[in-house]
Regions:
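Conserved mixed alpha/beta core segments that line enzyme active sites in large multi-domain catalysts
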Residues: 47-89, 271-272, 289-365
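Phosphate-backbone binding interfaces of nucleic-acid-interacting proteins
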Residues: 1-227, 256, 349, 374, ...
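A carboxyl-terminal module marker
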Residues: 21, 471-478, 617, 645-649, ...
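Glycine/proline-enriched, intrinsically flexible loops and inter-domain linkers
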Residues: 4, 10, 22-24, 52, ...
Length: 872
């Protein structure tokens, strides 16, 4: 949240700057606008002077005040004589008194929660308005009494200048919107007003004043302390389990402030700023630490100094340790959690005070009786904090900043700001002997060649401008005479580590819209466009869509219920399935071995929502476990794996072939008075596969399976395997087609005779001869069409008979189509009639009667070899 009034503390902004314009200025340097939150309060809300307040005890024991309040001539009542008189208002606040200046919400005003102010009769009077508290105006949580303007942080001259009827909307900033921006993970420094002000300066050139510069002037100098002079508290950092070799805490700064007034409260201006930032006011010490965090970006934690025993120890948690955090929740800690401990009764680091950088514990917290406060200002490893926050589900404001990276030089300045505010507002005495355990590493110098900007971003930028930009973002820049700079990034920019990072900064601050659009000058070598496999995949999708199927994408996760629904043995299938270590759903821990299993779920959901005739298809990967594959190594986080580790990872991955699957249900045709109302069956799935083959230039072979070898999920008499013909072999199996088993239909609530197919496209690509297809010349000679009807054994497949006709027809065959299948009383048992429509055509001549008679005899002879006779 960005409050323009707060932003003015660090950077000069023009008068009348709106949130809309501020958002545009920040977007220019990469800080994206999320939302502009308009005020929830509308007037009239004015200053009122309490002329009199008459206490009136009530039957319920409560005392209310019947008040007459002067709200200015514009808003005062008018008596019977036309004279302006104060308004009568009921107020139950205990701090109401005559002579006070208060905030009056008049009829027509709207308060947060869409609370409308209207005249109303209460306690025997007409209350013509309301005297408001902080909570009612959305300025804070205080509801113990109404706002008394003399206690609201105004100087005597400012208070005396307040007149009845003055507009409070602007006076208390009630009409000010606030800008919410999105901070990307690499821009953690912008998670503060200090950082946002710097970015506003980078965008507009407005004068920026870093608050840390002034704070550093007042920090106690630790070098040269008198010998034996004790610091506020001893600190020991003992990390015996660093993550990736990086210690969890490389700087811990502790500073005390004593004799703080325990009854002191946060001033109104601070409570208002915290409220507008979305934080709740708690106590002076806690509010100050939150305020400093929002202002500078350094999370702080306040301890009751009298409750903790030194030394403070920063270490990893031990197995079995527990911590009750400030939100009242108990957490079982792990050996990866970084914790802050103290040492009661001399037991070194034995008591856990809090989760470092995430949230403090109940013990040692600041209370209403705390007088001596210890401020913790530390720098923690982002990876360690992020893991702890996620493990314990505590996404605190502190952890959000630490996991994005905090300035390693900011800790003393943040503590100085905190103790100064506590001293000014609570009368405390800041210590001159803080303890600073500093193990931070010096940033590495980046050797940066200026021509990288041109090479990477395409921007022509002169050396002086490059130097100015890098200096302006806080870098120390040296050299440049030969086009090469030595650049030391600032401590608040942990994202700047390589030359490419500096190129990105230069491009960002010049403006991405300034990068010219240029066609690459290097000639394109080799083939462009889609690969052959991509073209085939697209053709398959187009063909299925043209057939009326709708593409679907399903999650690839399956479980026992899916196996059972498809009549599969759970134990056997799970052994050969890839199990996920951290599944999204515990009841689906495996990856699918075929698409049909997950596609069926999509079809079922659509049917349950009242749709009918649902036919879906999906192109996607399946996952086949390899029992001989090596175990996948555990790779470190935030560190690039070695080539050997990547090779081992690749070797352990399961095979992931590309499949296409379809599931068709309901009616085969659109409904209507001309429709046949035929249900989908196996023939529709076979037709779909056949059309796919024709679309991609492959003549698929459909071979019916014997009932005893049909997979359990499929209908034993209406299932076939799909093969790709390959010279010199019996073909390559690439899939299955047919109807689902009736029990599967019932298990999944699918209509009867639901048809499906699944093809292995990876195997198809490997078997195909992918090369340009030579187009056949169009013959100008007339075709000859003849019908053949054969009586054949029922065991003879139509495909086998069709192949015999093709072989006998030779080059004269143009097309063949099965148009009738008959089984009935006119034929003996075990026989059926198969009728084909065949078209013949020669490329170079008109076919003669003699030629056609010869072809017909050849076809008849080939059919007889299969025990099929021509019907006459």
């Amino acid at each position: 949240m960005v409050d323009i009034d707060w932003l003015k503390d660090h950077v000069e902004v023009p008068d009348g700057l709106t949130c809309e314009q501020l958002a545009k200025d920040l977007v220019r340097v990469g800080l994206e606008e999320e939302e502009i939150h308009a005020s929830q309060v509308t007037g009239p809300i004015v200053v009122g002077y309490v002329v009199d307040a008459t206490p009136e005890p009530q039957k319920n024991g409560k005392t209310i005040n019947w008040c007459h309040i002067d709200v200015g001539d514009k808003y005062n009542d008018v008596d019977a004589n036309g004279k302006k008189v104060p308004r009568g208002i009921i107020c139950g606040a205990p701090n109401m008194a005559a002579g006070e200046k208060v905030v009056v919400t008049l009829p027509g005003a709207v308060l947060p929660g869409d609370f409308k102010i209207e005249p109303r009769k209460t306690y025997g009077h007409i209350s013509d308005g309301m005297c408001a508290s902080e909570r009612e105006l959305g300025l804070g949580d205080s509801h113990n009494g109404i706002i008394l303007l003399r206690e609201y942080g105004f100087s005597k001259a400012e208070y005396d200048a307040l007149k009845p009827g003055d507009d409070v909307m602007d006076l208390l900033h009630l009409n000010k919107p606030i800008l919410e921006i999105n901070i990307t993970p690499d821009r953690g420094y912008a998670f503060s007003y200090r950082g946002v002000a710097r970015e506003y300066h980078n965008s507009t050139g407005a004068v920026y004043k870093d608050p840390v510069i002034e704070l550093n002037k007042d920090i106690p100098v630790l070098d040269g302390l008198p010998a034996g002079e004790p610091t506020d508290i001893d600190v020991s950092i003992e990390d015996n389990n660093p993550i990736h070799g990086v210690i969890g805490c490389d700087r811990y700064y502790a500073r005390a402030i004593r004799n703080v007034d325990a009854n002191a409260s946060s001033p109104q201006w601070m409570r208002r700023r915290l409220t507008r930032a979305g934080m709740r006011g708690i106590s002076l010490a806690v509010d100050v630490t939150n305020y400093v965090m929002l202002d500078l970006g350094q999370p702080l934690h306040a301890y009751d100094l009298d409750k903790i025993d030194g030394p403070i120890v920063v270490r990893r948690a031990r197995t079995g340790e527990h911590l009750t955090t400030l939100d009242g929740k108990d957490h079982e800690l792990t050996e990866e959690d970084l914790v802050i401990c103290d040492s009661p009764s001399g037991n070194h680091g034995s008591r856990v005070l809090g989760l470092a950088g995430v949230m403090g514990g109940m013990y040692g917290e600041v209370t209403s009786e705390t007088k001596n406060v210890l401020i913790e200002s530390a720098h923690f490893d982002p990876v360690s904090i992020a893991r702890t926050a996620r493990r314990h589900k505590i996404p605190s404001e502190a952890s959000r900043r630490f996991e994005r990276g905090v300035d390693t030089e900011l800790q003393p300045a943040a503590a100085q700001m905190a103790v100064k505010l506590l001293a000014d507002l609570g009368g405390g005495n800041p210590s001159k002997y803080p303890n600073d355990v500093n193990n931070t590493q010096q940033r590495s110098v980046i050797v940066f060649k200026a021509d990288e900007v041109k090479r990477v971003a395409g921007l022509d930028v002169d050396l002086n401008r490059i130097s100015d930009i890098l200096t302006d973002i806080g870098c120390s820049v040296a050299g440049g005479g030969n086009g090469s700079f030595s650049v030391l990034p600032p401590t608040w920019r942990p994202d700047l580590n390589e030359p490419c990072d500096l190129v990105e900064e230069i491009a960002r601050l010049i403006g991405y819209d300034e990068i010219p659009v240029k066609v690459p000058a290097v000639p394109i070598v080799g083939k462009t466009g889609l690969t052959a496999e991509q073209s085939i995949r697209r053709a398959i999708a187009y063909e299925l869509a043209e057939m009326g199927l709708v593409e679907s994408l399903s999650y690839p996760f399956v479980g026992e219920e899916d196996f059972k629904a498809f009549r599969q043995d759970v134990d056997e299938v799970s052994k050969v399935s890839v199990r996920i270590a951290n599944p999204l759903a515990e009841n689906r821990p495996w990856l699918r071995r075929n698409i049909l299993t997950t596609l069926a779920g999509s079809v079922r959901r659509n049917l349950h929502r009242g749709l009918s005739d649902v036919s879906l298809y999906e192109l996607g990967h399946v996952y086949l476990a390899d029992p001989k594959a090596p175990a996948i190594p555990a790779l470190p986080g935030c560190v690039r794996p070695t080539d050997a580790e990547l090779a081992a990872l690749d070797a352990g991955l399961p095979d992931q072939p590309l499949h296409v699957s379809a599931l068709m249900t309901g009616k085969a045709e659109e409904t209507g008075w001309l429709a046949t109302h035929r249900d989908v069956d196996w023939s529709d799935a076979v037709e779909a596969v056949t059309r796919l083959g024709k679309r991609i230039g492959v003549d698929f072979e459909i071979r019916q399976l014997s009932a005893n070898v049909v997979p359990a999920s499929w209908h034993p008499g209406r299932t076939a395997k799909v093969y790709v013909p390959v010279d010199g072999s019996d073909g390559v199996e690439i899939g299955i087609v047919g109807e689902l088993h009736p029990q599967v239909d019932e298990n999944l609530d699918l209509p009867k005779h639901s048809a499906a197919f699944e093809l292995d496209l990876t195997a198809l690509f490997a078997s195909m001869c992918i090369k340009p297809v030579q187009a056949k010349p169009v013959s100008t000679f007339p075709p000859v069409k003849q019908d053949f009807a054969f009586v054949a054994p029922s065991s003879l497949t139509a495909r086998d008979l069709e192949d015999a006709i093709k072989k006998a027809s030779g080059d004269l065959l143009e097309s063949i189509e099965l148009f009738d299948v008959y089984e009935g009383e006119q034929l003996s048992d075990g026989l059926r009639s198969l009728a084909y429509s065949v078209t013949f055509r020669a490329k170079d001549r008109t076919l003669s009667g003699e030629e056609m008679e010869s072809v017909r005899e050849s076809i008849t002879k080939s059919a007889k070899e299969l025990h099929a006779t021509l019907r006459v």
